Regions:
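Buried hydrophobic residues that stabilize the cores of well-folded domains
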Residues: 1-222
Length: 222
């Protein structure tokens, strides 16, 4: 998340962005639990819990458990849509790990194996829909290129950042052809240097850059 300082909590809210007379204004709140969520951290900086909101209500919770060296060991997920807990378990072997999600009945859904080599990682996930391979390249600890390969083709995301490590542009390619982009501008920061207000732009059907979302973050510290 690229957060600075000893963060205790992070609350993210997203709104529709509206262009009006050369300016961008905030519209209705987005009812999307991937865009409106809350994170809680311990004093080591590890995420201990998340909450996802839709329509102003919490619809999904996650709790994170780490081993003695700070590596994720288990994630427990609860949702108003499940009949019980879903879990993810991790098995570590040096710079490799296996990630296994289970459904609410305890059945293993898929298996994902990830290996890191210097500034690269490769993950292979195998499940009921076949296999998917993810390859990521990093620069200064930040992902700059992510490639997803599956039976339906290849998708590539390319990331650009500002001097503070905030993403400013994401380009998307599908089977080698350009398929859109997103650009982010940051206008408000808190005392620790973390952004609290940004505008997200996307490519319209005609290829022009148009405002898409306004995102706000509320951050508390230890």
């Amino acid at each position: 998340m690229g957060l600075r300082g000893n963060v205790r909590s992070l609350d993210v809210s997203a709104y529709e962005a509206k262009a009006c007379g050369g300016t961008v204004t905030k519209g209705s709140r987005v009812d999307d639990m991937q865009s409106c969520c809350s994170y809680r951290f311990d004093e080591r900086g590890y995420v201990t819990g998340t909450e996802y909101l839709c329509g102003g209500h919490v619809v999904k919770w996650e709790e994170f458990v780490y081993d003695g060296s700070g590596r994720p060991e288990r994630i427990v997920s609860r949702s108003v849509r499940y009949g019980g807990d879903r879990t993810v378990e991790f098995e570590w072997n040096g710079r490799c790990h296996v990630r296994r999600p289970f459904d609410e009945e305890g059945n293993e859904v898929s298996e994902e194996r990830t290996e890191w080599r210097r500034n690269r990682s490769e993950s292979v996930a195998v499940g009921g829909d076949g296999s998917v391979t993810f390859r990521t390249r990093y620069k200064r600890g930040l992902p700059v290129r992510q490639e997803r390969t599956a039976a339906d083709g290849t998708e590539v995301l390319k990331y650009s950042y500002d001097g503070n490590g905030n993403p400013v542009r994401v380009e998307r390619f599908v089977n080698g052809a350009a398929a859109g982009f997103a650009e982010m501008t940051y206008t408000v920061f808190d005392g620790a240097g973390n952004w609290t207000f940004r505008t997200v732009y996307r490519m319209a059907e005609g290829g022009e850059r148009v405002p898409y979302r306004i995102e706000e973050r509320k951050i508390t510290y230890y």
